[in-house]
């Protein structure tokens, strides 16, 4: 049975931890507001960019000579996967959920006997994936020193991907990230960015028609690289908001659990103290009676 001193030390230790988790929750809440706002503002832009490219692609006259970023290499033998995770922990199941999503895709690639290459963005994802997929990881990227998510970081990743694609290092590129829904819910996403998936358009469909100057091919050649960076930036913004939301939720839960533990330990301490006092009184009374 724990002594009174042991219980006092445990109560003090849990209270100290509770202060830390409460502070982390408040910091995450402050960061979440900004991250959520950035993610919500970025969604319309990335969606519009994607829609413009899809509209342009439907007007290409020579499909065989379409930009490779749109049409692909004609094969799907080598798959490059970009897995976005966090550089810091204490954010609940945020990292494990997206890793789980990515591993399902990796298993599918292995079953189809295709080649898998991985780029990890975030040290936590790298640490988990290297245990099983060490030989598949071709690049490790971290923005730990960046205070905020910015487009230049996404553009660096985008340029790296395009360079590898032009060197014929892969055929298909898919990005994995968490989409922010609310503080409690973050949804793991899987999005193919190379080649860009274009929906089948019916001949008699009455969609919006635009005239482009210069022609669609030239505009696409300029827009496609920007779109890749834009989609990566969107994923990074969503991931950042999801991370802060998950951390806030995890720290809130940890703070409440610490409070409950303090209450239980305090009750145990009071009972032990009461028992010790009662025992001491009995010994005093017994000693007095024996005199």
Language model: regions and residue ranges:
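C-terminal beta-strand-loop-alpha-helix "lid" module of Rossmann-like NAD(P)-dependent dehydrogenases
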Residues: 1-291
